[in-house]
C-alpha cells in the first residue's frame, strides 16, 4: 500500500504497525511519529496500524542546548 513518509511516496506491506515501519526503515534512538497530523504515543507503536494513504512524519529527537 502507498503512504507518504516525510513527503516521499513509500510502499509498505499491509498490516504494518508503526513499530514494523520503524524497523523496516532501520531507525533507532528517540523517535517521534505523526500520522495524519496526530502524534502517535510510543505506547501505541506496536498496535497502531498504518493505512493506505496515511501521511506520516518521523523525526529523531535530538538533545542539546546552550552550554555556558
Model-derived segments and spans:
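Ubiquitin-like/PB1-type beta-grasp interaction modules and other compact soluble beta-rich domains
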Residues: 1-68
